[in-house]
Amino acid sequence: MAFESLTERLQGVFKNLRGKRKLSEKDVQEVTKEIRLALLEADVALPVVKEFIKRVRKRAVGHEVIDTLDPSQQIIKIVNEELTAVLGSETAEIEKSSKIPTIIMMVGLQGAGKTTFAGKLANKLVKEENARPLMIAADIYRPAAIDQLKTLGQQINVPVFDMGTEHSAVEIVSQGLAQAKENRNDYVLIDTAGRLQIDEKLMTELRDIKALANPNEILLVVDSMIGQEAANVAREFNQQLEVTGVILTKIDGDTRGGAALSVRQITGKPIKFTGTGEKITDIETFHPDRMSSRILGMGDLLTLIEKASQDYDEQKSAELAEKMRENSFDFNDFIEQLDQVQNMGSMEDILKMIPGMANNPALANVKVDEGEIARKRAIVSSMTPEERENPDLLTPSRRRRIASGSGNTFVNVNKFIKDFNQAKKMMQGVMSGDMNKVMKQMGINPNNMPKNMDSSALEGMMGQGGMPDMSELSGTNMDVSQMFGGGLKGKVGEFAMKQSMKKMAKRMKKAKKRKK
């Protein structure tokens, strides 16, 4: 994920400040020097770095830091605020037309991800606004781009207008807009041609399309993996076309992230969306304050909550909770839950959105094996509908058939079913509030719990029967996390369990005091 090295460097800088009661001007100079080096290593453009450091230093050498009793927190606060300002301060929405359709023109270099982004944005508009977009394939130089856009359109059930490669891009856009008005589409997304580098022919064509379409938005799609060159590309396109916003693609890649910090400052135009993966749903509205928080390792709970809420169905959740309580959770429910977890993104990225988890050493032990998840899916897919609904039907002969059909060994199938049954029992205990049962399932003897810990009161920690934090179940005899292809292992898992027990003991003390 982008920014990982920058986050690590900045956290190291802030760590060195801890314990200091006050900072001298010399200390501030040293801190800002380290921040400057960290930004340059992250491929942030030099002019942006200079301006950023100048602003941080100006605030830090004043009364804001030198006279404060907690300089490390104050420095972090200043850096966070200035970083947010560099990224744009406020979230920028799509500029909509007062009359339909709203026309959005995608521009950028070849390979930046314009076509893919057009599909992602169209899907987002359909899902969130119940919109009726039309996509126009205006890249006449790459037949593959037209085919790709049509494939994406079929995937998300959005119409694509194309006239092949025999007509000019301007003619195609003209005909496409006429069709959009006739069909009363509320959005038109124009996928334009790109080049491996900026040239006058490309710009002339784009200017002609702009003059014809009069778009509400001209979104520059930038590949975040090209580093400092992103700033030059953004500057040139903005000078020629006056873009209205920027899209950063491939931000999930192993990049240094400097593009995000450079583009906004150099063009003066807001970053509106980021591409966070290969799936059609891997698109996020860009929030400067949240991105700043992520870069500084402070997490991003709001985005995490939004991701979790996208496919949330209150009725289904209530039904699932009841099935857990009644111990009738089946393999169909398991696959449904697996889909929901995977739709949120990789487990590593989800954990990094939790405050304090970015670059946490424990994350090095969290490994989600996609192959393992695929094997579990294959096992369930090889079951009959009756077997999925009633796991008790799985006799040894049926398990051998499932192993053969799914390409797994008999041992692996047995282990999967055993883990599933143990997880069911544990979930039933959690939902019913029987914590003694839960601890036994986890391999913990309730009699060995700390004396100041009343297990009957543990259900108060669960939010009145809610599910516990599954990360606190790691390092136990029953590794429920393995059901989803990964988890904390070894000494780290054991340490996490002990820390969890200590936290629960403290919370029990507080709960008892409140009752008194």
UniProtKB/Swiss-Prot annotation:
Subcellular location: Cytoplasm
Main location: cytoplasm
GO molecular function: 7S RNA binding; ATP hydrolysis activity; GTP binding; GTPase activity
Keyword Hydrolase: yes
Position of the signal peptide: none
Catalytic reaction equation(s): GTP + H2O = GDP + phosphate + H(+)
GO cellular component: signal recognition particle
Gene Ontology annotations of biological process type: SRP-dependent cotranslational protein targeting to membrane
Binding of GTP, residues: 108-115, 191-195, 249-252
Documented EC number(s): 3.6.5.4
SUBUNIT field: Part of the signal recognition particle protein translocation system, which is composed of SRP and FtsY.
Entry comment, domain topic: Composed of three domains: the N-terminal N domain, which is responsible for interactions with the ribosome, the central G domain, which binds GTP, and the C-terminal M domain, which binds the RNA and the signal sequence of the RNC.
Protein family per UniProt: Belongs to the GTP-binding SRP family. SRP54 subfamily.
HAMAP family reported for this sequence: SRP54
Name this protein carries in UniProt: Signal recognition particle protein
